[in-house]
């Protein structure tokens, strides 16, 4: 080749300048060295090659003038800290500020990015092909960047000091290049010369991956907890503790005591006679031994042996019946009263859901025979038809017979009337007859029974006369709706028991028709209802009018039954379904160390009533639903329908008559004769449906009510409890259907809680998910009006 020498300096012809860089083809890469070939000698860098003789010398380079000490330099203005902070703040603000990009711009940027990636991949493949690297060693082979064409020079232009431009950029390993010559043959490449960069990148990438995995593990442990892994290893050697293990100096097989000692070879069988028995033997073995002993007695003693054997067998039979194991296995109903243990009484109370408190309280009675009532009274109980006592009767009668003050908390329809009438008759029977002397008639009754409504007072009077007429006691009711002259005439012969409403009794006391000089027994039935109707002040007046000579002491003696029976102290009993604060206030003031009996939980409905709740808004829809219920034939009369306001009673009664059913109404605007006639028509079966307000919700006993419909939900959960208590009485089952609306939000929470506690009722999904049923509402001082009875409530803290 002209002007080209492989191992020496290049010499160009003198007549021709070197070709331009763009006219020459690119220099091919050097071939890879053979394994057997020796590396080329190092280049001689002692002196630069001389320039060609015929070549035109290059123009001399202009020397830069050195600036001396006196030369003026351009003053450099330093950047202030404020300027740097301002620029950084502007850069951060610009980076943090979101930049809106249109869809076209986003597509353009994506296409540009993709084009750059494709271009980079194509360039990488081209370089690998040009360098002769295969795909298997692509990671370890370095990638050489392409040099621009303007920097590719082959022919030297002279010493570096005489060149116009800087030294061209060289590619390839530094060991294969000659610092002064461009065309020196390259040295063989070192295989690990460029692996340092890749190993550093791989190690950095591996460190980042390890850090990411560690962060993920920490986050998982933070939110999901630590994994429960066992550290137990079966292969791990464990040191056995032999500190407490006693090692004999001889082995067990060396023991020869069993060979020569006959005590170990022939064991003696113990024989126990009579009441003796081997531990662990059953009753059958004991019986066989007893019979064996009895036969031995008969054989040895011909005269009295048979008698002794018979007595011994009877004694063994008694012992077996009264054994501790047999008594524990028996149910409380199979045991005798003297065999009842504390555990049996606890089970008995749990069976009847009885809870008592208040000092030394006697155990409940299991049957009428164990009640302690006189024989004459037990005969009357059997004649009336009381077969088994109710839970409140089981618990309250023994306490009342010990002359203790009593607070009975029980649901409606649980037999509370008999629970206070029977102890009252026992108390009065021990007093002198009231008609024995004329002055006794004028001193007033022995006992007073207070009831909140006229209907309840008359109902108690009917129930009391079943017992008082055979015993010769006189019972008089004093209620509103009748003239005072008529009631004064009924008191002319005196009365042992007076059943009255608080308002009318206060009128009689203030008009001197009645005095309470010898009253020694007070019963308040439905005390919470009396407070709700605004009778707290009349009740306080009546209790303050009682004599103080026979008042109980407020000490431990009030809990001593013997001390209370020795002196005729006044006895006070209060029955209620709920315990508001006003009732507790009266109890603290007038009762002395009372025993409290609770059947179930205060304010709960009976378990025999199935409660159904339907969310129906609007009068028309409710009337249509009521017609469907009555026409279904599922429920037999009598049926009670409750409304909230008395003017709706007549409207609902007319609708029911249009449906083909007979109906009567009961509310506060009715006269006493109309009320009695309405209740009588329902009780004797001549009327199918009774439409009433809350007046009939407390204490009215209509037998065999199969259905109660709350056309309007009660304003309080207590009223609702007594409404549905009209059915499911005396152990019978019943159904209560309630129409609920958004206006009843104040009682939804309590209603849902009551339905959840009932084992036979279900909470509808609409009520369960209703907003008002999620938390108990906070109520303030509300003044409410009871339109059904005509009394205005004084208000109470709810």
UniProtKB/Swiss-Prot annotation:
Reactions accelerated catalytically: ATP + H2O = ADP + phosphate + H(+)
GO CC, any one term: cytoplasm
Motif (DEAD box): 525-528
Record organism: Aspergillus clavatus (strain ATCC 1007 / CBS 513.65 / DSM 816 / NCTC 3887 / NRRL 1 / QM 1276 / 107)
The organism's place on the tree of life at top rank: Eukaryota
The protein's name in its UniProt record: Pre-mRNA-splicing ATP-dependent RNA helicase prp28
Region annotated Disordered, chain positions: 1-79, 112-212, 761-798
EC identifiers of the protein: 3.6.4.13
One GO BP: RNA splicing
């Amino acid at each position: 080749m002209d002007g080209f020498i492989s191992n020496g300096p290049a010499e160009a012809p003198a007549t021709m300048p070197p070709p331009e860089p763009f006219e020459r083809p690119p220099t091919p890469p050097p071939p890879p060295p053979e394994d057997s070939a020796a590396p080329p000698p190092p280049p001689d860098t002692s002196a630069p090659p001389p320039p060609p003789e015929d070549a035109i010398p290059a123009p001399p380079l202009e020397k830069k003038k050195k600036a001396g000490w006196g030369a003026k330099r351009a003053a450099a203005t330093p950047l202030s800290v404020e300027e740097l902070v301002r620029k950084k703040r502007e850069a951060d603000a610009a980076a943090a500020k979101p930049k809106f990009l249109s869809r076209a711009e986003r597509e353009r940027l994506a296409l540009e990015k993709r084009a750059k990636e494709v271009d980079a991949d194509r360039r990488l493949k081209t370089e690998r092909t040009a360098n002769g690297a295969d795909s298997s060693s692509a990671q370890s082979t370095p990638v050489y960047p392409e040099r621009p064409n303007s920097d590719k020079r082959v022919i030297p232009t002279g010493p570096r000091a005489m060149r116009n431009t800087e030294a061209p950029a060289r590619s390839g390993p530094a060991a294969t290049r000659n610092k002064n010559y461009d065309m020196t043959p390259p040295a063989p490449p070192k295989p690990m010369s460029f692996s340092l960069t890749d190993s550093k990148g791989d190690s950095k990438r591996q460190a980042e991956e390890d850090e990411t995995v560690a962060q993920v593990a920490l986050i998982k442990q933070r939110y999901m907890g630590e994994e429960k892994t066992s550290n137990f290893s079966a292969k791990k050697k464990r040191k056995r503790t032999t500190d407490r293990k006693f090692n004999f100096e001889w082995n067990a097989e060396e023991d020869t005591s069993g060979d020569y000692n006959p005590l170990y070879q022939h064991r003696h069988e113990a024989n126990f006679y009579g009441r003796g028995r081997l531990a662990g033997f059953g009753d059958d073995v004991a019986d066989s031994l007893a019979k064996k002993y009895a036969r031995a007695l008969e054989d040895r003693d011909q005269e009295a042996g048979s008698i002794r054997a018979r007595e011994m067998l009877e004694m063994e039979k008694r012992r077996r019946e009264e054994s501790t194991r047999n008594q524990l296995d028996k149910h409380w109903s199979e045991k005798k009263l003297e065999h009842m243990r504390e555990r049996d009484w606890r089970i008995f109370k749990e069976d009847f859901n009885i809870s008592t408190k208040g000092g030394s309280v006697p155990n409940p009675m299991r049957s009428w025979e164990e009640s302690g009532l006189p024989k004459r009274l037990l005969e009357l109980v059997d004649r009336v038809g009381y077969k088994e006592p109710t839970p409140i009767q089981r618990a309250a009668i023994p306490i009342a017979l010990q002359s203790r003050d009593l607070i009975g908390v029980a649901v409606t329809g649980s037999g509370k009337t008999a629970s206070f009438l029977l102890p009252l008759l026992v108390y009065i029977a021990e007093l002198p007859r009231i008609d024995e002397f004329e002055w006794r008639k004028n001193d007033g009754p022995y006992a007073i029974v207070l009831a909140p409504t006229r209907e309840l007072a008359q109902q108690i009077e009917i129930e009391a006369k079943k017992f008082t007429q055979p015993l010769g006691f006189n019972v008089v009711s004093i209620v509103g709706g009748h003239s005072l002259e008529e009631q004064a005439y009924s008191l002319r012969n005196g009365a042992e028991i007076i059943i009255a409403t608080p308002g009318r009794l206060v009128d009689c006391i203030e008009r001197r028709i009645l005095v309470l000089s010898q009253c020694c027994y007070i019963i308040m039935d439905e005390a919470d209802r009396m407070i709700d109707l605004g009778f707290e002040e009349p009740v306080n007046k009546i209790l303050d009018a009682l004599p103080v000579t026979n008042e109980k002491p407020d000490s431990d003696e009030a809990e001593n039954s013997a001390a209370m029976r020795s002196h005729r102290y006044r006895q006070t009993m209060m029955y209620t379904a709920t315990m508001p604060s006003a009732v507790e206030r009266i109890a603290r003031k007038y009762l002395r160390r009372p025993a409290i009996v609770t059947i179930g939980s205060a304010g709960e409905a009976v378990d025999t009533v199935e409660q159904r709740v339907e969310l129906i808004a609007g009068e028309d829809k409710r009337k249509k639903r009521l017609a469907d219920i009555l026409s279904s034939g599922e429920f037999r009369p009598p049926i009670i329908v409750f409304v909230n306001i008395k003017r709706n009673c007549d409207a609902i009664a007319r609708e029911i008559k249009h449906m083909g059913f007979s109906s009567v109404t009961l509310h506060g605007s009715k006269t006493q004769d109309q009320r009695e006639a309405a209740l009588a028509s329902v009780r004797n079966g001549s009327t199918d449906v009774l439409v009433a307000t809350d007046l009939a919700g407390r204490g009215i006993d209509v037998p065999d009510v199969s259905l109660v419909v709350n056309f309007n939900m009660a304003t309080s959960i207590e009223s609702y409890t007594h409404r549905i208590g009209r059915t499911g009485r005396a152990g019978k089952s019943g159904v209560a259907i309630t129409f609920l609306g958004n206006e009843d939000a104040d009682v939804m929470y309590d209603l849902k809680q009551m339905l959840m506690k009932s084992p036979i009722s279900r909470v509808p999904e609409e009520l369960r998910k209703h907003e008002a049923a999620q938390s108990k509402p906070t109520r303030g001082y509300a003044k409410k009006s009871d339109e059904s009875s005509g009394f205005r409530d004084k208000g109470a803290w709810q």
